[in-house]
């Protein structure tokens, strides 16, 4: 059986990124891994269904300057399913009220999804679906 084990995201601030996914999506943070020789730190965030995100920080990576949330080649977004339209609406409003950009929605898409798209603290697009 093939399954995606985890996705990894670069961040400028491990704690800020961790708090976003813990507070709004119920992730549980694992311990921090540190490799001082490479200027590298990382941490896994696990969700209730077993899905994981690895958040990583390094001193050797130059930030790419693009408009936050702008589309680009490569990973464009990842989706988190909440199970109901009401939960999508409620979380989207909570994120908006807490100052996180809502890029789209909540809305029903042409292919039947009910979703919104928000930006995490590093400008990654997070699609919130039913």
Regions found by a protein language model. Name each.
Residues 1-2, 130:
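Absolute protein N-terminus
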Residues 2, 10-53, 59:
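Core segments of cupin and vicinal oxygen chelate
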Residues 4-12, 43-47, 66-130:
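Vicinal oxygen chelate
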Residues 25, 71, 98-99:
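Extracytoplasmic/secreted proteins and extracellular or luminal domains
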Residues 31, 64-67:
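Short, P/G- and charge-enriched loop/turn segments at secondary-structure junctions
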Residues 61-64, 98:
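A short local loop/turn or secondary-structure capping micro-motif enriched for an aromatic residue
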